[in-house]
């Protein structure tokens, strides 16, 4: 009977010690997997951030193109017809009713001040 008890005790001690080792290994594996998961999340976060920055750059580029196209048209040079209500004559020019050569056109032209 003593041999059965000794054998049972030996098996019990081995099972407990090996079980503890497995438990420690499992804990280590879980920590490694958690660290890998964090690195994957960091990688995914960086990738998403990069995509968002590219999208933002494209949107800002489109906005700047719109503002470039919506700016005021170029100024009108000397001797060119202009609108009395919305003169776009270049600096140094004034939108005036013509004298002599343009009287019959009934339009305003850009002239020097």
Curated annotation (Swiss-Prot):
Tissue: Expressed by the venom gland.
Keyword line: Disulfide bond, Ion channel impairing toxin, Knottin, Secreted, Signal, Toxin
GO cellular component: extracellular region
Classification via Pfam families: Toxin_22
Prosequence residues removed at maturation: 22-74
Principal location class: secreted
Annotated signal sequence range: 1-21
Similarity comment: Belongs to the neurotoxin 14 (magi-1) family. 01 (HNTX-16) subfamily.
Function per UniProt: Probable ion channel inhibitor.
Name recorded for this polypeptide: U11-theraphotoxin-Hhn1a
Organism: Cyriopagopus hainanus
